[in-house]
Amino acid sequence: MRLIIEPDYDKLSTWAADYVIERIHKAAPTAEKPFVLGLPTGSSPIGMYRELVKACKEGCISFRHVITFNMDEYVGLATEHPESYHSFMHRHLFDHIDILPQNIHILNGNAPDLTAECDAYERAIEAAGGIDLFIGGIGPDGHIAFNEPGSSLTSRTRIKTLTTDTVLANSRFFDNDTNQVPKRALTVGVGTIMDAREVMILVNGHTKARALREAVEGAVSQMWTITALQLHRQSIIVCDEAACVELKVGTYNYFKDIERNNL
């Protein structure tokens, strides 16, 4: 596992966007062999998306041969609702880059058969050749996607009931009214994420400090699903200084030292 520690959120976002661009360029995707990208929502990736949009508009990167799969979507929230993840992704990324509409994949939380929708999503990922780079964020309780504490570390795409903590955290997007927040979601599983050839997680702010500590220094546990990343063959956590306040001094200094030429 790599840990990239940047001074602040803006620097974190720029580093993450530059890494995505680098990986796409290195893959040199074509229509026959596209680059497959897993994408998150929430507040953490917004800065990265802003930088990717800027790079695309400046001609530094093209998404024409990129296929995307989003991590999750609320159940029962209309696609056109401003807080649906469909709306979020189009607002922050898809409407501003040259990605082909048919290459965008987001779970349908209003599907008549939600289990069938989840199974079809897994098959679509497999048919695309698997995910080259899965990007994600984490919650204060260490959940990745909507894999709440207690989720199986081998889980696949499925329906999940959200914890009270997650509902409270997400209520900031719903006028701080928990009654408006959907209580269920469709989400890729921990196993789905771990199948990606590479995983990059964005962690910012002091509210994520304990989760980062568990991710880097804690034992692998289903109670902190982010800890599964320790077992991944190629994983990166990109964080800011505020998220590092609970790391041991030795841990912090170690990663600052070995990554000093990559910041």
Swiss-Prot record:
EC number: 3.5.99.6
Site (Part of the allosteric site): S151, R158, K160, T161, Y254
Active-site residues annotated for this sequence: D72 (proton acceptor), D141 (for ring-opening step), H143 (proton acceptor), E148 (for ring-opening step)
Protein name, UniProt field: Glucosamine-6-phosphate deaminase
Keyword DNA repair: no
Function: Catalyzes the reversible isomerization-deamination of glucosamine 6-phosphate (GlcN6P) to form fructose 6-phosphate (Fru6P) and ammonium ion.
CDD domains (alphabetical): GlcN6P_deaminase
Enzyme's top EC category: hydrolase
Gene coding for it: nagB
One Pfam family cited in the UniProt record for this chain: Glucosamine_iso
The organism of origin for this protein: Porphyromonas gingivalis (strain ATCC 33277 / DSM 20709 / CIP 103683 / JCM 12257 / NCTC 11834 / 2561)
Listed pathway(s): Amino-sugar metabolism; N-acetylneuraminate degradation; D-fructose 6-phosphate from N-acetylneuraminate: step 5/5
Reaction equations catalysed: alpha-D-glucosamine 6-phosphate + H2O = beta-D-fructose 6-phosphate + NH4(+)
Key words, A-Z: Allosteric enzyme, Carbohydrate metabolism, Hydrolase
